[in-house]
């Protein structure tokens, strides 16, 4: 399997060239299909579950951290379909999602692309409606909640309803990692049961000369505790879920978000966060945490395989605690979405790959082993193995618990195409730096949301 980890000028297929510039950001609203090209239809009229026996290349464009997983999935798919060559290309997540409209609106496009939000892509008919493939492969008989975030209404905006435009191998889950040895030093024998317990532990860590919480503020890690604090203050997930799914009239500029921003800013003021929090990215944060910098690290299950190996059994995981003991836990989740660009000429092969990564036992195991993501798929599909008591097993157990209790909600970052890089990242940086107030922060989030939805 051929693999690239950067995006130089290259030929996606012999004789076909595209300049690929650098699965949540700007430009989506302004980049539609070029007017010189023929009108698009996003719904295939002739689909097949047979991919034939002619040699073909399937180009898969994902974020760089996902490359090892898709390399493994591609190799497994090639073993089943030797006439298919899966070519995986990786790019920085923010850069990739910023440039998705350009990457899929030309005549030379990847066959599968990692998405985090849909923006104008559905409205501009740049993504393939997967409903015909869902019928052909039997996805319609699977639990449908797994597809909620990748359904888009006829208005091209509201999610959770309408046609299916994406699917993926597994699901993310947020929570808090903790260093067991450092926790023992501050007298913490079990994960905090309430937000107050967590804050008390962070104060003890500071008093002991330890960094209370490692966070990657450079590329959005501050949004994880922020959203959990918002859901705690709002007494549930409905407000933020309606907002995430672009439900008409949804508004996040509420006392709950102001309260959440106030708490997060307070953590910074108290010295609970790294002094250089706004320059720490998602590669540096887990590495520094695994080396013993920080008692706590809010992040997602995609970090579990690496931290399990690097931490030597000294790292645990717990769900973000509620305000009061006994209240339900909540967490953010999203499918690792792959979409088929309308202009791809390998729709059937791409759909076959999507079906394979959701149903093949080996592919499902790789999804958990390499990226820590519990797979979706058919209700009767076998569950991947994880070592009892391991960090990965702990994240899987947490996911199953929240799945059953309806405590999972999409990421605020996925609400619009520009929300992550253009709004949440810079606004949370300003917040923890003390350069904006909680009320100004809350208003700015809603303002940018409304601007993106125009």
Language-model segment annotations:
Residues 1-58, 79, 450-454:
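Short, low-complexity disordered leader/linker segments with a strong preference
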Residues 79, 162, 186, 270, ...:
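Extracytoplasmic/periplasmic substrate-recognition and gating elements
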Residues 302-305, 324, 336-418, 439:
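Mature extracytoplasmic/periplasmic domains
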Residues 246, 331, 393-449:
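C-terminal capping/gating helix-and-loop segments adjacent to ligand/active sites or protein-protein/ligand interfaces
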Residues 159-169, 174, 199-249, 294:
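Extracytoplasmic/periplasmic solute-binding protein
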Residues 76-149, 184-186, 190-193, 288, ...:
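Extracytoplasmic "Venus flytrap"/periplasmic binding protein-like
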Residues 118-174, 225, 316-318:
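Hinge/lid segment of periplasmic solute-binding proteins
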């Amino acid at each position: 399997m051929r693999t690239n980890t950067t995006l130089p000028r290259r030929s996606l297929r012999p004789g076909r060239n595209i300049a690929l510039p650098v699965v949540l950001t700007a430009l989506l609203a302004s980049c539609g299909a070029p007017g010189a090209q023929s009108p698009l239809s996003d719904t295939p009229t002739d689909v097949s579950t047979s991919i034939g026996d002619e040699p073909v290349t399937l180009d898969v464009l994902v974020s760089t951290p996902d490359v090892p997983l898709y390399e493994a999935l591609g190799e497994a798919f090639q073993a089943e379909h030797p006439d298919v060559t899966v070519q995986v290309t990786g790019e920085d997540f923010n850069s990739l999602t910023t440039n998705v409209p350009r990457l899929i609106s030309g005549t030379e496009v990847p066959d599968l692309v990692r998405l985090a939000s849909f923006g104008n892509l559905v409205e501009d008919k740049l993504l393939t409606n997967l409903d015909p493939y869902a019928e052909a492969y039997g996805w319609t008989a699977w639990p449908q909640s797994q597809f909620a975030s990748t359904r888009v209404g006829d208005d091209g905006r509201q999610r959770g309803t309408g046609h299916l435009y994406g699917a993926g191998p597994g699901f993310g889950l947020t929570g808090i990692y903790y260093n067991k040895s450092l926790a023992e030093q501050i007298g913490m024998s079990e994960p905090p049961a309430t937000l107050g317990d967590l804050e008390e532990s962070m104060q003890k860590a500071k008093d002991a000369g330890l960094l209370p919480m490692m966070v990657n503020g450079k590329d959005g890690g501050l949004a994880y505790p922020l959203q959990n604090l918002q859901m705690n203050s709002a007494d549930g997930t409905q407000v933020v879920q309606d907002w995430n799914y672009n439900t008409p009239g949804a508004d996040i500029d509420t006392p709950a978000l102001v309260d959440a921003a106030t708490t997060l800013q307070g953590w910074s003021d108290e010295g609970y966060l790294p002094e250089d929090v706004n320059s720490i990215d998602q590669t540096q944060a887990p590495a520094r945490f695994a080396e013993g910098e920080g008692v706590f690290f809010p992040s997602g299950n995609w970090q579990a395989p690496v931290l399990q190996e690097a931490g030597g059994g000294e790292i645990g995981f717990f769900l973000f605690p509620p305000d009061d003991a006994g209240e339900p836990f909540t967490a953010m989740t999203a499918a690792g979405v792959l979409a088929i660009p309308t202009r791809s000429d390998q729709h059937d092969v791409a759909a076959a790959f999507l079906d394979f990564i959701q149903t093949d036992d080996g592919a499902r195991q790789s999804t958990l082993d390499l990226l820590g993501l519990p797979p979706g798929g058919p209700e009767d599909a076998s569950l991947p193995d994880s070592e009892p008591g391991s960090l990965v097993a702990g994240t899987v157990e947490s996911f199953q618990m929240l799945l059953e209790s309806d405590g999972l909600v999409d990421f605020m970052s996925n609400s619009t195409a520009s929300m992550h890089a253009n709004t949440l990242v810079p606004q949370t940086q300003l917040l923890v730096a003390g350069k904006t107030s909680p009320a100004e922060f809350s208003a700015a989030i809603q303002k940018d949301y409304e601007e993106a939805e125009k």
